[in-house]
Swiss-Prot record:
This is FERM domain-containing protein 8. PANTHER family: FERM DOMAIN-CONTAINING PROTEIN 8, KREV INTERACTION TRAPPED 1-RELATED. The modification Phosphothreonine is found at residue 420. Keywords: Acetylation, Cell membrane, Cytoplasm, Membrane, Phosphoprotein. Residues 30-377 form the FERM domain. The gene is Frmd8.
Amino acid sequence: MEGAEGNAGQPGPAERSHRSSVSSVGARAADVLVYLADDTVVPLAVENLSSISAHELHRAVREVLQLPDMALEAFALWLVSPLLEVQLKPKHQPYKLGRQWPELLLRFTDASDDDIAMDEPSLQFRRNVFFPKRRELQVHDEEVLRLLYEEAKGNVLTARYPCDLEDCEVLGGLVCRVQLGPYQPGQPAACTVREKLDSFLPAHLCKRGHGLFAAFRGRGAKTGPCEQGLLNAYRQVKEMAGGDSERETTLGSHYRAYLLKCHELPFYGCAFFHGEVDKPTQGFLHRGGRKPVTVAISLEGVHVIDNREKHVLLGLRFQELSWDHTSPEEEEPVLWLEFDGDSEGTPVNKLLRIYSKQAELMSVLIEYCIELSQAAEPALPQESASGPQEAPSPSSAPTQRPKLRRQGSVVCSRIQHLSTIDYVEDGSGIKRVKPKRTTSFFSRQLSSSHGSYTVVQPNDNSPEQG
Protein backbone atom coordinates (compact mmCIF):
# COMPACT_ATOMS: atom_id res chain seq x y z
CA MET A 1 0.00 0.00 0.00
CA GLU A 2 2.93 2.30 0.54
CA GLY A 3 5.38 3.43 -2.08
CA ALA A 4 2.90 3.69 -4.93
CA GLU A 5 4.76 6.56 -6.52
CA GLY A 6 7.99 4.62 -6.66
CA ASN A 7 6.32 1.66 -8.39
CA ALA A 8 4.04 3.61 -10.70
CA GLY A 9 4.59 2.86 -14.35
CA GLN A 10 6.88 -0.11 -13.80
CA PRO A 11 5.48 -3.11 -15.71
CA GLY A 12 5.48 -6.45 -13.95
CA PRO A 13 6.30 -9.82 -15.50
CA ALA A 14 2.91 -9.98 -17.20
CA GLU A 15 2.70 -6.24 -17.93
CA ARG A 16 0.36 -5.89 -14.98
CA SER A 17 -0.43 -2.54 -13.44
CA HIS A 18 -0.41 -1.86 -9.73
CA ARG A 19 -3.08 0.11 -7.93
CA SER A 20 -2.24 1.83 -4.69
CA SER A 21 -4.81 2.10 -1.94
CA VAL A 22 -3.10 5.10 -0.34
CA SER A 23 -3.21 8.14 -2.59
CA SER A 24 -1.63 10.66 -0.22
CA VAL A 25 -0.12 10.38 3.22
CA GLY A 26 0.20 13.16 5.73
CA ALA A 27 1.36 13.14 9.31
CA ARG A 28 -1.94 11.75 10.59
CA ALA A 29 -4.38 11.55 7.68
CA ALA A 30 -4.53 9.81 4.33
CA ASP A 31 -6.87 9.31 1.40
CA VAL A 32 -7.51 5.58 1.20
CA LEU A 33 -8.77 4.20 -2.11
CA VAL A 34 -11.06 1.19 -1.95
CA TYR A 35 -11.73 -0.51 -5.29
CA LEU A 36 -15.07 -2.04 -6.23
CA ALA A 37 -15.61 -5.00 -8.55
CA ASP A 38 -16.22 -2.72 -11.56
CA ASP A 39 -12.89 -0.90 -10.93
CA THR A 40 -14.57 2.24 -9.64
CA VAL A 41 -12.92 3.78 -6.61
CA VAL A 42 -14.32 4.82 -3.24
CA PRO A 43 -11.97 7.46 -1.74
CA LEU A 44 -11.97 7.66 2.04
CA ALA A 45 -10.32 10.36 4.15
CA VAL A 46 -8.93 8.42 7.09
CA GLU A 47 -7.39 9.57 10.36
CA ASN A 48 -4.76 7.39 12.02
CA LEU A 49 -4.36 5.16 9.00
CA SER A 50 -1.80 2.90 10.62
CA SER A 51 -4.22 1.73 13.31
CA ILE A 52 -7.60 1.75 11.57
CA SER A 53 -9.27 -1.67 11.35
CA ALA A 54 -10.88 -3.41 8.40
CA HIS A 55 -14.20 -3.21 10.24
CA GLU A 56 -14.00 0.59 10.44
CA LEU A 57 -13.06 0.92 6.77
CA HIS A 58 -15.84 -1.48 5.81
CA ARG A 59 -18.36 0.69 7.66
CA ALA A 60 -17.04 3.81 5.92
CA VAL A 61 -17.46 2.19 2.49
CA ARG A 62 -21.02 1.14 3.32
CA GLU A 63 -21.86 4.68 4.40
CA VAL A 64 -20.47 6.22 1.20
CA LEU A 65 -22.33 3.71 -0.99
CA GLN A 66 -25.45 3.86 1.22
CA LEU A 67 -25.64 0.09 1.45
CA PRO A 68 -28.07 -1.72 3.77
CA ASP A 69 -27.02 -3.66 6.85
CA MET A 70 -26.87 -6.93 4.89
CA ALA A 71 -23.78 -5.60 3.11
CA LEU A 72 -21.83 -6.15 6.31
CA GLU A 73 -22.41 -9.87 5.87
CA ALA A 74 -22.26 -9.98 2.07
CA PHE A 75 -18.95 -8.18 1.53
CA ALA A 76 -15.48 -8.11 3.02
CA LEU A 77 -12.34 -6.09 2.50
CA TRP A 78 -9.54 -7.83 0.62
CA LEU A 79 -5.90 -7.10 -0.04
CA VAL A 80 -5.36 -8.18 -3.63
CA SER A 81 -2.42 -8.29 -6.01
CA PRO A 82 -1.57 -10.52 -8.99
CA LEU A 83 0.47 -12.70 -6.63
CA LEU A 84 -1.78 -13.09 -3.58
CA GLU A 85 -5.34 -12.45 -2.38
CA VAL A 86 -6.23 -12.17 1.30
CA GLN A 87 -9.69 -11.64 2.78
CA LEU A 88 -9.30 -9.50 5.88
CA LYS A 89 -10.87 -10.24 9.23
CA PRO A 90 -12.71 -7.31 10.86
CA LYS A 91 -9.90 -6.88 13.40
CA HIS A 92 -7.13 -6.78 10.78
CA GLN A 93 -5.35 -3.49 10.17
CA PRO A 94 -5.00 -3.12 6.38
CA TYR A 95 -2.15 -0.62 6.50
CA LYS A 96 0.01 -2.86 8.67
CA LEU A 97 -0.73 -5.89 6.50
CA GLY A 98 0.22 -3.82 3.47
CA ARG A 99 3.56 -3.04 5.08
CA GLN A 100 4.04 -6.77 5.70
CA TRP A 101 3.10 -7.71 2.14
CA PRO A 102 6.64 -8.73 1.02
CA GLU A 103 6.87 -11.12 3.98
CA LEU A 104 3.49 -12.63 3.08
CA LEU A 105 4.61 -13.11 -0.52
CA LEU A 106 7.80 -14.84 0.61
CA ARG A 107 5.79 -17.17 2.83
CA PHE A 108 2.85 -17.98 0.58
CA THR A 109 4.10 -17.61 -3.03
CA ASP A 110 6.95 -18.73 -5.26
CA ALA A 111 7.42 -15.22 -6.65
CA SER A 112 10.92 -14.02 -7.49
CA ASP A 113 12.61 -11.27 -5.52
CA ASP A 114 12.05 -8.84 -8.41
CA ASP A 115 8.34 -9.63 -8.60
CA ILE A 116 7.98 -9.28 -4.85
CA ALA A 117 9.74 -5.92 -4.91
CA MET A 118 7.33 -4.60 -7.56
CA ASP A 119 4.13 -6.16 -6.24
CA GLU A 120 1.73 -3.95 -4.33
CA PRO A 121 -1.75 -4.83 -3.07
CA SER A 122 -4.89 -2.82 -3.53
CA LEU A 123 -7.74 -2.69 -1.04
CA GLN A 124 -10.88 -4.17 -2.58
CA PHE A 125 -14.51 -4.44 -1.50
CA ARG A 126 -15.53 -7.92 -2.60
CA ARG A 127 -17.90 -10.75 -1.84
CA ASN A 128 -17.36 -12.45 1.50
CA VAL A 129 -16.29 -16.07 1.02
CA PHE A 130 -18.39 -17.02 4.06
CA PHE A 131 -21.62 -15.47 2.71
CA PRO A 132 -23.93 -18.44 1.96
CA LYS A 133 -25.72 -18.60 -1.37
CA ARG A 134 -29.00 -19.17 0.48
CA ARG A 135 -28.50 -15.77 2.15
CA GLU A 136 -27.70 -14.18 -1.18
CA LEU A 137 -31.14 -15.24 -2.38
CA GLN A 138 -32.60 -12.87 0.21
CA VAL A 139 -30.83 -9.78 -1.18
CA HIS A 140 -33.21 -7.24 -2.72
CA ASP A 141 -31.19 -4.03 -2.60
CA GLU A 142 -30.27 -3.14 -6.18
CA GLU A 143 -26.82 -1.74 -5.39
CA VAL A 144 -25.85 -4.87 -3.47
CA LEU A 145 -27.11 -6.98 -6.36
CA ARG A 146 -25.14 -4.84 -8.81
CA LEU A 147 -21.89 -5.23 -6.88
CA LEU A 148 -22.36 -8.99 -6.65
CA TYR A 149 -23.23 -9.09 -10.36
CA GLU A 150 -20.13 -7.09 -11.36
CA GLU A 151 -17.84 -9.40 -9.41
CA ALA A 152 -19.45 -12.55 -10.80
CA LYS A 153 -19.31 -11.14 -14.33
CA GLY A 154 -15.61 -10.39 -13.96
CA ASN A 155 -14.93 -13.94 -12.79
CA VAL A 156 -16.84 -15.38 -15.74
CA LEU A 157 -15.15 -13.16 -18.34
CA THR A 158 -11.68 -13.97 -17.00
CA ALA A 159 -12.56 -17.70 -16.94
CA ARG A 160 -12.01 -17.84 -13.22
CA TYR A 161 -15.44 -19.42 -13.22
CA PRO A 162 -15.15 -22.00 -16.02
CA CYS A 163 -18.43 -22.20 -17.94
CA ASP A 164 -19.73 -24.24 -20.83
CA LEU A 165 -20.39 -22.29 -24.01
CA GLU A 166 -24.16 -22.59 -23.59
CA ASP A 167 -23.99 -21.07 -20.12
CA CYS A 168 -21.57 -18.35 -21.25
CA GLU A 169 -24.07 -17.37 -23.92
CA VAL A 170 -26.93 -17.15 -21.43
CA LEU A 171 -24.82 -15.06 -19.05
CA GLY A 172 -23.52 -12.95 -21.92
CA GLY A 173 -27.08 -12.31 -23.08
CA LEU A 174 -27.92 -10.90 -19.66
CA VAL A 175 -24.83 -8.67 -19.80
CA CYS A 176 -25.98 -7.41 -23.21
CA ARG A 177 -29.35 -6.57 -21.71
CA VAL A 178 -27.76 -4.68 -18.80
CA GLN A 179 -25.31 -2.74 -20.97
CA LEU A 180 -27.27 -2.26 -24.21
CA GLY A 181 -30.87 -2.17 -22.99
CA PRO A 182 -33.76 -4.33 -24.21
CA TYR A 183 -33.21 -6.21 -27.46
CA GLN A 184 -34.63 -4.29 -30.42
CA PRO A 185 -34.92 -6.20 -33.72
CA GLY A 186 -34.46 -3.03 -35.75
CA GLN A 187 -31.17 -2.01 -34.10
CA PRO A 188 -27.75 -3.16 -35.39
CA ALA A 189 -27.16 -5.34 -32.33
CA ALA A 190 -24.91 -7.76 -34.23
CA CYS A 191 -22.33 -5.06 -34.99
CA THR A 192 -22.34 -3.82 -31.41
CA VAL A 193 -21.93 -7.33 -30.05
CA ARG A 194 -19.14 -8.13 -32.52
CA GLU A 195 -17.18 -5.01 -31.64
CA LYS A 196 -17.43 -5.66 -27.89
CA LEU A 197 -17.53 -9.43 -27.88
CA ASP A 198 -14.98 -9.78 -25.08
CA SER A 199 -17.26 -7.66 -22.88
CA PHE A 200 -19.89 -10.39 -23.06
CA LEU A 201 -17.97 -13.67 -23.43
CA PRO A 202 -14.70 -15.01 -21.96
CA ALA A 203 -11.69 -14.12 -24.08
CA HIS A 204 -10.80 -17.73 -24.94
CA LEU A 205 -14.24 -18.17 -26.54
CA CYS A 206 -14.06 -15.10 -28.77
CA LYS A 207 -10.51 -15.19 -30.12
CA ARG A 208 -10.32 -14.34 -33.78
CA GLY A 209 -7.63 -14.82 -36.36
CA HIS A 210 -5.09 -12.13 -37.09
CA GLY A 211 -3.12 -11.11 -40.11
CA LEU A 212 -4.09 -10.50 -43.73
CA PHE A 213 -7.30 -12.53 -43.74
CA ALA A 214 -8.61 -10.83 -40.62
CA ALA A 215 -7.89 -7.43 -42.12
CA PHE A 216 -10.37 -8.11 -44.93
CA ARG A 217 -13.14 -9.00 -42.54
CA GLY A 218 -15.51 -6.08 -42.61
CA ARG A 219 -18.50 -5.10 -40.61
CA GLY A 220 -20.75 -6.88 -43.02
CA ALA A 221 -19.07 -10.22 -42.40
CA LYS A 222 -21.20 -13.17 -41.47
CA THR A 223 -21.90 -13.52 -37.76
CA GLY A 224 -19.78 -16.23 -36.11
CA PRO A 225 -21.30 -19.08 -34.08
CA CYS A 226 -20.40 -17.53 -30.71
CA GLU A 227 -21.83 -14.18 -31.76
CA GLN A 228 -25.01 -15.80 -33.05
CA GLY A 229 -25.47 -17.80 -29.86
CA LEU A 230 -24.96 -14.63 -27.83
CA LEU A 231 -27.48 -12.72 -29.93
CA ASN A 232 -30.02 -15.52 -29.52
CA ALA A 233 -29.54 -15.43 -25.75
CA TYR A 234 -29.86 -11.63 -25.76
CA ARG A 235 -33.08 -11.90 -27.73
CA GLN A 236 -34.51 -14.40 -25.24
CA VAL A 237 -33.88 -12.33 -22.09
CA LYS A 238 -37.25 -11.93 -20.42
CA GLU A 239 -38.42 -8.43 -19.57
CA MET A 240 -40.51 -7.35 -16.62
CA ALA A 241 -43.72 -5.51 -17.34
CA GLY A 242 -43.39 -1.78 -16.78
CA GLY A 243 -42.17 1.45 -18.30
CA ASP A 244 -39.03 3.53 -18.00
CA SER A 245 -39.93 4.49 -14.45
CA GLU A 246 -39.29 0.89 -13.42
CA ARG A 247 -35.87 0.69 -15.06
CA GLU A 248 -34.02 0.20 -11.76
CA THR A 249 -36.33 -2.61 -10.74
CA THR A 250 -35.84 -4.21 -14.14
CA LEU A 251 -32.05 -4.00 -13.89
CA GLY A 252 -32.23 -5.53 -10.44
CA SER A 253 -34.13 -8.49 -11.87
CA HIS A 254 -31.39 -9.02 -14.48
CA TYR A 255 -28.66 -8.79 -11.85
CA ARG A 256 -30.53 -11.42 -9.87
CA ALA A 257 -31.00 -13.64 -12.94
CA TYR A 258 -27.26 -13.49 -13.62
CA LEU A 259 -26.43 -14.43 -10.03
CA LEU A 260 -28.94 -17.28 -9.99
CA LYS A 261 -27.33 -18.70 -13.12
CA CYS A 262 -23.92 -18.40 -11.45
CA HIS A 263 -25.28 -20.24 -8.41
CA GLU A 264 -25.44 -23.32 -10.63
CA LEU A 265 -21.65 -23.21 -10.89
CA PRO A 266 -20.22 -25.30 -8.04
CA PHE A 267 -17.33 -22.89 -7.45
CA TYR A 268 -19.37 -19.68 -7.24
CA GLY A 269 -18.22 -17.52 -4.33
CA CYS A 270 -15.00 -19.47 -3.77
CA ALA A 271 -11.65 -18.27 -2.53
CA PHE A 272 -8.92 -19.11 -5.06
CA PHE A 273 -5.41 -20.42 -4.48
CA HIS A 274 -2.47 -21.26 -6.73
CA GLY A 275 -0.95 -24.73 -6.92
CA GLU A 276 0.37 -27.55 -9.09
CA VAL A 277 -0.55 -31.22 -9.49
CA ASP A 278 1.27 -34.15 -11.04
CA LYS A 279 0.38 -35.06 -14.60
CA PRO A 280 -0.33 -38.72 -15.38
CA THR A 281 2.69 -40.40 -16.95
CA GLN A 282 2.33 -40.71 -20.70
CA GLY A 283 4.21 -42.12 -23.63
CA PHE A 284 7.11 -44.53 -24.00
CA LEU A 285 9.36 -42.47 -21.72
CA HIS A 286 6.66 -42.17 -19.04
CA ARG A 287 6.94 -38.41 -19.03
CA GLY A 288 4.87 -36.71 -16.41
CA GLY A 289 5.64 -33.31 -14.99
CA ARG A 290 3.19 -30.93 -13.39
CA LYS A 291 0.36 -28.70 -14.46
CA PRO A 292 -0.65 -25.40 -12.82
CA VAL A 293 -4.06 -25.43 -11.18
CA THR A 294 -6.35 -23.17 -9.26
CA VAL A 295 -7.86 -24.55 -6.06
CA ALA A 296 -11.32 -23.10 -5.37
CA ILE A 297 -12.67 -23.49 -1.83
CA SER A 298 -16.16 -22.51 -0.70
CA LEU A 299 -18.62 -23.33 2.06
CA GLU A 300 -19.67 -26.38 0.04
CA GLY A 301 -16.45 -28.04 -1.06
CA VAL A 302 -13.20 -28.00 -3.01
CA HIS A 303 -12.62 -27.78 -6.76
CA VAL A 304 -9.33 -28.17 -8.61
CA ILE A 305 -9.36 -26.27 -11.92
CA ASP A 306 -6.93 -26.67 -14.83
CA ASN A 307 -5.55 -23.20 -15.54
CA ARG A 308 -4.76 -23.87 -19.19
CA GLU A 309 -7.76 -25.92 -20.28
CA LYS A 310 -10.18 -23.96 -18.08
CA HIS A 311 -12.10 -26.95 -16.86
CA VAL A 312 -12.56 -28.80 -13.58
CA LEU A 313 -10.17 -31.64 -12.81
CA LEU A 314 -11.73 -32.60 -9.49
CA GLY A 315 -14.77 -31.45 -7.55
CA LEU A 316 -15.53 -32.72 -4.05
CA ARG A 317 -18.05 -31.81 -1.40
CA PHE A 318 -16.72 -31.84 2.13
CA GLN A 319 -18.73 -35.01 2.81
CA GLU A 320 -16.71 -36.74 0.08
CA LEU A 321 -13.18 -36.05 1.26
CA SER A 322 -10.67 -35.96 4.05
CA TRP A 323 -7.61 -33.76 3.91
CA ASP A 324 -4.37 -32.67 5.47
CA HIS A 325 -1.37 -30.51 4.65
CA THR A 326 2.32 -31.21 5.11
CA SER A 327 5.27 -28.85 4.97
CA PRO A 328 8.43 -30.83 5.74
CA GLU A 329 11.73 -29.00 5.86
CA GLU A 330 13.46 -28.55 2.52
CA GLU A 331 10.41 -29.94 0.70
CA GLU A 332 7.42 -28.29 -0.93
CA PRO A 333 4.27 -27.80 1.13
CA VAL A 334 1.49 -30.12 -0.02
CA LEU A 335 -2.28 -30.14 0.43
CA TRP A 336 -3.50 -33.74 0.39
CA LEU A 337 -7.04 -34.61 -0.68
CA GLU A 338 -8.38 -38.14 -0.14
CA PHE A 339 -11.56 -39.39 -1.78
CA ASP A 340 -13.32 -42.50 -3.09
CA GLY A 341 -12.55 -43.86 -6.53
CA ASP A 342 -11.96 -47.03 -8.46
CA SER A 343 -9.06 -48.62 -10.29
CA GLU A 344 -10.16 -50.88 -13.14
CA GLY A 345 -13.40 -51.59 -11.33
CA THR A 346 -11.86 -52.09 -7.89
CA PRO A 347 -12.94 -49.60 -5.16
CA VAL A 348 -9.95 -47.70 -3.83
CA ASN A 349 -9.13 -44.60 -1.86
CA LYS A 350 -7.38 -41.95 -3.92
CA LEU A 351 -4.84 -39.41 -2.73
CA LEU A 352 -4.20 -36.22 -4.67
CA ARG A 353 -1.15 -34.08 -3.97
CA ILE A 354 -1.47 -30.36 -4.56
CA TYR A 355 1.90 -28.64 -4.35
CA SER A 356 1.49 -25.11 -3.07
CA LYS A 357 3.04 -22.70 -0.62
CA GLN A 358 -0.57 -21.81 0.16
CA ALA A 359 -1.33 -25.35 1.41
CA GLU A 360 -1.57 -24.17 4.99
CA LEU A 361 -4.03 -21.41 4.04
CA MET A 362 -6.16 -23.90 2.11
CA SER A 363 -6.20 -26.41 4.96
CA VAL A 364 -7.25 -23.77 7.49
CA LEU A 365 -10.01 -22.51 5.19
CA ILE A 366 -11.37 -26.02 4.60
CA GLU A 367 -11.53 -26.62 8.33
CA TYR A 368 -13.26 -23.30 9.00
CA CYS A 369 -15.79 -23.81 6.18
CA ILE A 370 -16.70 -27.21 7.61
CA GLU A 371 -17.17 -25.70 11.06
CA LEU A 372 -19.45 -23.02 9.62
CA SER A 373 -21.46 -25.58 7.66
CA GLN A 374 -21.98 -27.75 10.72
CA ALA A 375 -23.00 -24.76 12.83
CA ALA A 376 -25.53 -23.66 10.20
CA GLU A 377 -27.23 -27.06 9.76
CA PRO A 378 -29.65 -26.79 12.75
CA ALA A 379 -30.83 -23.36 11.56
CA LEU A 380 -31.73 -24.41 8.02
CA PRO A 381 -35.20 -25.91 8.68
CA GLN A 382 -36.37 -22.77 10.52
CA GLU A 383 -35.10 -20.48 7.77
CA SER A 384 -36.72 -22.48 5.00
CA ALA A 385 -40.07 -22.29 6.77
CA SER A 386 -40.26 -18.53 6.40
CA GLY A 387 -40.72 -18.52 2.65
CA PRO A 388 -39.53 -19.82 -0.71
CA GLN A 389 -36.90 -17.07 -1.10
CA GLU A 390 -35.18 -18.21 2.09
CA ALA A 391 -34.93 -21.88 1.25
CA PRO A 392 -31.39 -23.24 1.41
CA SER A 393 -29.67 -23.63 -1.92
CA PRO A 394 -29.16 -27.42 -1.63
CA SER A 395 -32.92 -27.87 -2.01
CA SER A 396 -32.73 -26.61 -5.58
CA ALA A 397 -29.58 -28.52 -6.48
CA PRO A 398 -31.29 -31.62 -7.93
CA THR A 399 -33.03 -29.51 -10.59
CA GLN A 400 -30.06 -27.27 -11.35
CA ARG A 401 -27.14 -29.67 -11.40
CA PRO A 402 -28.27 -31.82 -14.38
CA LYS A 403 -28.14 -28.73 -16.60
CA LEU A 404 -24.41 -28.49 -15.95
CA ARG A 405 -23.66 -32.20 -15.95
CA ARG A 406 -24.02 -32.46 -19.68
CA GLN A 407 -21.61 -34.62 -21.62
CA GLY A 408 -18.13 -33.11 -21.43
CA SER A 409 -19.20 -30.18 -19.24
CA VAL A 410 -16.29 -28.09 -17.98
CA VAL A 411 -17.63 -28.42 -14.42
CA CYS A 412 -17.45 -32.23 -14.38
CA SER A 413 -14.45 -33.90 -12.76
CA ARG A 414 -11.72 -35.30 -14.99
CA ILE A 415 -9.94 -37.62 -12.61
CA GLN A 416 -8.27 -39.38 -15.54
CA HIS A 417 -6.24 -36.21 -16.07
CA LEU A 418 -4.80 -36.45 -12.55
CA SER A 419 -2.00 -38.56 -11.12
CA THR A 420 -3.23 -39.97 -7.81
CA ILE A 421 -1.99 -42.50 -5.27
CA ASP A 422 -4.47 -45.38 -5.06
CA TYR A 423 -4.65 -47.71 -2.07
CA VAL A 424 -6.88 -49.90 0.06
CA GLU A 425 -7.11 -49.80 3.82
CA ASP A 426 -4.65 -52.53 4.77
CA GLY A 427 -1.90 -50.97 2.71
CA SER A 428 -1.85 -53.42 -0.20
CA GLY A 429 -1.48 -50.65 -2.70
CA ILE A 430 -2.83 -51.09 -6.17
CA LYS A 431 -0.43 -48.59 -7.69
CA ARG A 432 1.68 -47.58 -4.71
CA VAL A 433 2.17 -49.39 -1.42
CA LYS A 434 1.17 -47.43 1.66
CA PRO A 435 1.70 -48.36 5.35
CA LYS A 436 -0.97 -50.35 7.16
CA ARG A 437 -3.74 -48.30 8.72
CA THR A 438 -7.06 -48.98 10.42
CA THR A 439 -8.74 -45.69 9.55
CA SER A 440 -8.70 -43.17 6.76
CA PHE A 441 -5.28 -41.98 5.65
CA PHE A 442 -6.21 -38.66 7.24
CA SER A 443 -8.12 -38.13 10.44
CA ARG A 444 -9.32 -34.71 9.27
CA GLN A 445 -12.68 -35.17 7.61
CA LEU A 446 -16.33 -34.24 7.95
CA SER A 447 -17.16 -37.14 10.25
CA SER A 448 -20.21 -35.76 12.05
CA SER A 449 -22.40 -35.43 8.97
CA HIS A 450 -23.85 -38.15 6.81
CA GLY A 451 -21.26 -38.06 4.07
CA SER A 452 -20.58 -40.51 1.29
CA TYR A 453 -16.86 -40.88 1.92
CA THR A 454 -15.82 -44.37 3.07
CA VAL A 455 -12.57 -46.13 3.77
CA VAL A 456 -12.11 -48.97 1.31
CA GLN A 457 -11.76 -52.36 2.99
CA PRO A 458 -9.38 -54.93 1.51
CA ASN A 459 -10.67 -58.17 0.06
CA ASP A 460 -9.13 -61.41 -1.05
CA ASN A 461 -9.78 -60.61 -4.70
CA SER A 462 -7.85 -57.33 -4.69
CA PRO A 463 -5.30 -57.28 -7.49
CA GLU A 464 -1.65 -57.22 -6.60
CA GLN A 465 0.49 -54.19 -7.09
CA GLY A 466 1.12 -53.64 -10.77
